[in-house]
């Protein structure tokens, strides 16, 4: 975010220059100096304040540092711009406001959506829709699993709290514009659902507004809808458009024409917004430069900051209410005291797609479950009765997590990045887990590998005795990490005297919330390109069946097979999987790409890769989509012992 600030400052027309940057990271300081070469660099904020006399300090640091840094800046006589979320608690905001007034300085918050075109246009149109009677602020987003730099992102609830100010301040600002005056006692109602969905009702005078923020609602969206006695305004912040319906719309001709008017506005507005964005070469977040200009102008003229104290304060307080509600959810999912019927299990990877289901199933069958993960899950992602311990498998803390355990299920693995990441977080972590388990006296280990580590059937069926791939790097970093981890497990089991069971799941799919496996094809908007033939079978396994199988193996470890290719007992065809996909996406168009077409295209792509990246490993796309045949006999026998998979 700091780089966006540097670019936006450089783009302002109000005379302003970036004179200094403070960052404990040399990489961070250098990245800013590449944008603003004249900026002097400091390793700490205290050093910067001793060496410089800035008019404005931009605070673009982790949230837990905002209050202290803002207070230091105000005490030094600086105006302060604070990125959202501004601070964690209303009491902190009140203290900063008091200090700013005392020092005759101002505070501005990172509420840049108010300076984007949709918000500005909507404000201009407000008088045309008559007396406002309702405002709706809606925000739907998908939490990131990785940052742009490839690091593990914040957990989902913290991502929610990070973006929450946007829909909150939009609602508050429109309420303030429509009905000036203090909000009546804060939120009228506020709730946080078990999936992280926030619902709220806020009121200012006679005008009420609703707030909805969801992690699971689709499509991703962000809008404000204002309804008045003479029409409505829909400000769309995803497509950067505004659709307006001015007039009562009660006549027969209006009812017929309104959809066409809205369609024209949407198509024209979206096309224009795309053109403006590309034509201007947007280098920072939309609205950021405009907000900076307005704030700097207010400082030069001695006027009020562009974001009112009331809006900033109420935004912080509403977000604080949500933070407290989320903390309440965490209390509800705390481990319950009970008499365990099964072993004590350390589960790595217990916050992932498969791991979450395994943790729930282990707890359900009576195991004491301890999950070790690099970050704690959001409250709504925690399994009841499961203990979560934050730590890195390659660092200290693993030995402590293993204390009192009877068994380890090692399901953690790197899922992104290149060779170094998979070497560290798949292969290296696997070695650390097994050696630590042996040192802690935990002799039973279930290692979760992947079906992708096995060589091709070459006309026969792949079963538990099929050899591993000879060229471990031929299928990319992920498969290489999984394959070398399995080889390492086999070696260390003998060296350390461990009893190890290896489970190789096929592509894991959740039939209750269906997302197509990668080997089925690729979705491009509303078109799905399916590769191969409708009759091809895919080596997949139902998430629920996989979790119940792993829990059953933990409960009856001694009877578990040494190797298990975990698959659905009856493998589905691509046609069957596409039929399920179409059920959830009735507007989807399916196009088939036969293998006889893909093979020459893949050969051409390999040639281009060798020309463009000499010495690099070329990826054979046709090999990725090859059709293999699997012997599901062992999975079928286990399924019968578990009853039919749901």
Model-derived regions, located:
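Mid/C-terminal beta-alpha module of Rossmann-like enzyme folds, strongest
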Residues: 196, 226, 333-343, 549-618
């Amino acid at each position: 975010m700091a780089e966006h600030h540097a670019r936006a400052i450089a783009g302002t027309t109000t005379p302003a220059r970036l004179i200094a940057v403070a960052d404990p990271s040399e990489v961070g300081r250098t990245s800013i100096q590449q944008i603003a070469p004249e900026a002097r660099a400091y390793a700490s904020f205290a050093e910067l304040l001793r060496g410089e006399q800035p008019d404005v300090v931009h605070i673009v640091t982790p949230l837990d540092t905002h209050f202290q840094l803002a207070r230091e800046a105000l005490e030094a006589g600086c105006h302060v711009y604070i990125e959202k979320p501004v601070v964690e608690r209303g009491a902190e905001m009140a203290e900063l406001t008091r200090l700013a007034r005392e020092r005759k300085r101002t505070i501005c918050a990172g509420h840049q959506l108010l300076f984007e075109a949709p918000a500005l246009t909507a404000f201009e149109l407000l008088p045309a829709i008559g007396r406002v009677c309702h405002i709706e602020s809606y925000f739907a987003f998908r939490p990131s699993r990785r940052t742009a730099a490839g690091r593990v992102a914040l957990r989902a609830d913290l991502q929610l709290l990070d973006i929450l100010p946007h829909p909150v301040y939009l609602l508050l600002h429109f309420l303030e514009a429509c009905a000036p005056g203090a909000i009546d006692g804060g939120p009228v109602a506020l709730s946080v659902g078990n999936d992280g969905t926030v619902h709220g009702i806020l009121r200012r005078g006679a005008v009420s507004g609703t707030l909805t923020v969801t992690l699971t609602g689709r499509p991703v969206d962000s809008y404000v809808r204002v309804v008045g006695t003479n029409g409505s305004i829909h400000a769309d912040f995803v497509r950067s458009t505004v659709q307006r319906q001015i007039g009562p719309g009660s006549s027969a001709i209006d009812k017929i024409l309104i959809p066409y008017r809205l369609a024209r506005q949407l198509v024209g507005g979206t096309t224009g917004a795309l053109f403006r964005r590309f034509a201007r070469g947007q280098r920072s977040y939309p609205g950021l430069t405009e907000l900076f200009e307005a704030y700097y102008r207010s400082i030069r003229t001695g006027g009020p900051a562009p974001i009112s104290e009331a809006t900033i304060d109420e935004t912080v307080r509403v977000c604080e209410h949500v933070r407290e509600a989320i903390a309440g959810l965490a209390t509800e999912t705390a481990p319950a005291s009970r008499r365990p019927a099964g072993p004590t299990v350390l589960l790595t990877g217990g916050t992932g797609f498969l791991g979450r289901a395994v943790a729930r199933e282990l707890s359900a069958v009576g195991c004491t479950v301890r999950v070790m993960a690099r970050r704690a899950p959001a409250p709504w992602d925690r399994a009841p009765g499961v203990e979560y311990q934050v730590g890195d498998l390659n660092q200290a803390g693993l030995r402590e997590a293993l204390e009192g355990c009877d068994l380890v299920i090692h399901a953690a693995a790197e899922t992104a990045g290149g060779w170094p990441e998979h070497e560290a977080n798949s292969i290296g972590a696997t070695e650390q887990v097994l050696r630590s388990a042996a040192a802690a006296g935990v002799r039973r280990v279930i290692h979760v590998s992947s079906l992708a580590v096995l060589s091709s059937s070459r006309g026969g069926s792949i079963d538990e005795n099929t050899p591993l791939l000879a060229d471990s790097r031929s299928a990319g970093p992920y498969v290489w990490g999984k394959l070398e981890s399995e080889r390492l497990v086999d070696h260390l089991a003998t060296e350390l005297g461990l009893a190890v069971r290896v489970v190789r799941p096929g592509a894991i799919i959740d039939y209750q919330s269906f997302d197509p496996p990668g080997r089925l094809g690729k979705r491009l908007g509303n078109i799905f390109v399916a590769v191969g033939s409708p009759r091809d079978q895919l080596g997949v396994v139902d998430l629920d069946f996989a979790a119940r199988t792993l829990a059953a193996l933990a409960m009856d470890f001694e009877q578990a097979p040494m190797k298990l290719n975990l698959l659905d007992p009856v493998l589905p065809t691509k046609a069957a999987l596409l039929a399920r996909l179409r059920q959830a996406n009735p507007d989807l168009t399916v196009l088939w790409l036969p293998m006889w077409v893909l093979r020459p295209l893949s050969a051409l792509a390999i040639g281009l890769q060798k020309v463009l990246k000499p010495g690099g490993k070329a990826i054979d796309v046709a090999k990725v989509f090859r059709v293999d045949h699997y012997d599901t006999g062992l999975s079928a026998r286990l399924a019968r012992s578990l009853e039919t998979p749901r």
